[in-house]
Curated annotation (Swiss-Prot):
Source species taxonomy: Bacteria, Bacillati, Actinomycetota, Actinomycetes, Streptosporangiales
Protein name: Large ribosomal subunit protein uL11
Protein family per UniProt: Belongs to the universal ribosomal protein uL11 family.
This protein's record includes keyword Calcium: no
PANTHER family given in the database record: 60S RIBOSOMAL PROTEIN L12, LARGE RIBOSOMAL SUBUNIT PROTEIN UL11M
Source domain of life: Bacteria
Function: Forms part of the ribosomal stalk which helps the ribosome interact with GTP-bound translation factors.
GO molecular function list: large ribosomal subunit rRNA binding; structural constituent of ribosome
Keywords in alphabetical order: Methylation, Ribonucleoprotein, Ribosomal protein, RNA-binding, rRNA-binding
Gene that this sequence comes from: rplK
Subunit structure: Part of the ribosomal stalk of the 50S ribosomal subunit. Interacts with L10 and the large rRNA to form the base of the stalk. L10 forms an elongated spine to which L12 dimers bind in a sequential fashion forming a multimeric L10(L12)X complex.
A GO cellular component annotation in the UniProt record: cytosolic large ribosomal subunit
UniProt xrefs under InterPro entries: Ribosomal_uL11 (IPR000911), Ribosomal_uL11_bac-typ (IPR006519), Ribosomal_uL11_C (IPR020783), Ribosomal_uL11_C_sf (IPR036769), Ribosomal_uL11_N (IPR020784), Ribosomal_uL11_N_sf (IPR036796)
Modification after translation: One or more lysine residues are methylated.
Record GO biological process: translation
Amino acid sequence: MPPKKKLAAVVKVQLPAGQATPAPPVGTALGPHGVNIMEFCKQYNAATESQRGNIIPVEISIYEDRSFSFVTKTPPAPALILKAAGLEKGASTPSRSVAGSITRDQVREIAQTKLPDLNTTSLEAAEKIIAGTARSMGIEVK
């Protein structure tokens, strides 16, 4: 069994699915670590091609020999909520105005999508987390 690679850094970035390029933010995040940026872009784009149109958070583990591995996460909850509500952005004053609304079914669907990345295993708790996020954005849950 080969010895384990020694971890040098972990970089977290949010990139459009299937559209990573060596330009910032990828280049500025990976450049100082000496990683082959084009290779990362090719692998990331291939891994996220099916989710095109979403912003996908990615956690890149960089090793001392300049190799890397990465783990993609689910899209951010606010992005999924805005997409479900058909909005560009939330309310400017969430406590006073309502930007739009989403249904309980849409909240359940978003919660099921986000469940692997949330710190709960219960779907009901995940729904409450998503509903709270929507409320803080000025989006009503009906």
